[in-house]
């Protein structure tokens, strides 16, 4: 698979442009190669994000240069390894948040905080986890090692929310 490499320069001030570009590249799933140089696989779902980043750099008065790296086995292997390492770090962070979510539900049960407002809040938290899962899954082209565990943990979180919801509704039925 060919890769796109973006190298750019931005004016030193204001720094918000540099931060915005950095955030956009991270959100896109690009991997940093060195300061001001990032890489991502060529094609969907990365093309639109790269175009947006290039526009942001240009609008901020910067100079973007985009190169397409041929599907060279040695380079591709190194880039795939960096890319998968980045996705693995994202999955690890996601798994930690799944653990926090399950702990939060257990704490609410222990406190007897079984209200509809709390249920709504926990549903929103699960929706956030689902959005995050989809975003990482979309970028994880090479199947990072923790992807399957993340899928299982998200299902566990959904099941934990169902059990919490059952308790909330049972608590509402009590006089």
Provide a role label for each language-model segment.
Residues 1-106, 131-134, 138, 157:
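Positively charged, polar, low-complexity stretches
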Residues 10, 14, 115, 120, ...:
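Residues lining hydrophobic/aromatic ligand-binding pockets adjacent to catalytic sites
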